Amino acid sequence: MSHFEAFMLALIQGLTEFLPVSSSAHLILPSEILGWPDQGLAFDVAVHVGTLAAVILYFRKEVVTLLSAWITSIFKGKHTAESKLTWMIALATIPACIFGLFMKDFIELYLRSAWVIATTTIIFAILLWWVDKHSEHKFDEYQTGWKRALFIGLAQAAAIIPGTSRSGATMTAALYLGFTREAAARFSFLMSIPIIVLAGSYLGLKLVTSGVPIDFSALSIGIAVSFISAYACIHAFLKLVTRVGMMPFVIYRLVLGFGLIAFLLSK
C-alpha cells in the first residue's frame, strides 16, 4: 500500500465511521473502481485505533463521568442517570457481539459484495428518511430504558451486514423510538466506544497471531488521518444535525447506492 492510498483510505474511514452513510460502501469503491488492493489486517487495526481515540477524546468529559458513575454503582450501589446510561450502553453492545460472533463467517462469505452494499445503502436511506420525518424528537439519551437500549442494540447488530452503516442503523432506531436528532447521534457515538474497542481488540489479536509483516509508516498515517478526520466529523455532525436533519445523508446514500449499481451494471 502506498502512502497516498493509506492517506485516502484512512480519510474515508474517519469521515464515514460516524456518519450515517456506511464506511464499507465507501471503502469498496477504491478497490472496485481504482483496483486498489485490500488494506490488510494491520491497517484495519490502525484506523480502529484512530477513530476510537477521536470519539473518546471528543466525549472525554462524558466518558469520565459515565465510567465513574458506573463504577460507583457497582461498588457502592449508588445509581444515577449517568450510571444507568452506562449500563444501557453495555446492554446495547451485547446483540452485536453475539451476532458478530456467530454470523461473521457467513457474512464475509455471502454478503460482502458490492451488490449487497448498494442494496442496503438504498434500503437504509429510505428507512432513515421515514423515521426522521415521523419521529417525535422528544427524548434524550438519559431517558434510555432497557427496551430502547436493546432495540438500538439489535439495530447495531444488523449493521454488521455490509452497507448498512453502524451509526446509520443506530440513529435510525433511536429516531424511531422518539429521540431527538442530537440525542440519537450522541447515543450512537457513545455506543461506538465499546464496539470499536472489542472489534479492534479482536483484529489486534488476529494480527499478533498471524505473523503478517507490518508497514509502520502506513499505519502511522492511518492512525493520524483517521483520528483527525473522525474528530472533525463528529464535531461537525453534532453541530449540523439539529439544523439540517438527516435529509442530506438520505440523498447522499441514495446517490451512492444507485451510482454503485449503475457502475456494476456497466462493467
From Swiss-Prot:
GO MF entry, a single one: undecaprenyl-diphosphatase activity
Keywords for the protein's UniProt record, in alphabetical order: Antibiotic resistance, Cell inner membrane, Cell membrane, Cell shape, Cell wall biogenesis/degradation, Hydrolase, Membrane, Peptidoglycan synthesis, Transmembrane, Transmembrane helix
Enzyme class, first EC level, given as a word: hydrolase
Source species, domain of life: Bacteria
Membrane topology qualifier: Multi-pass membrane protein
A Pfam family matched in the record: BacA
Enzyme Commission number, as recorded: 3.6.1.27
Catalytic activity: di-trans,octa-cis-undecaprenyl diphosphate + H2O = di-trans,octa-cis-undecaprenyl phosphate + phosphate + H(+)
GO biological process, one term: cell wall organization
UniProt subcellular location: Cell inner membrane
Record-linked InterPro entries: UppP
Gene Ontology cellular component list: plasma membrane
Keyword Transmembrane helix assigned: yes
Transmembrane annotation, as ranges: 39-59, 87-107, 111-131, 149-169, 189-209, 218-238, 244-264
Predominant place of localization: membrane
PANTHER family: UNDECAPRENYL-DIPHOSPHATASE
Remarks, miscellaneous: Bacitracin is thought to be involved in the inhibition of peptidoglycan synthesis by sequestering undecaprenyl diphosphate, thereby reducing the pool of lipid carrier available.
Membership in a protein family: Belongs to the UppP family.
Function: Catalyzes the dephosphorylation of undecaprenyl diphosphate (UPP). Confers resistance to bacitracin.
Protein name as catalogued: Undecaprenyl-diphosphatase
Gene: uppP
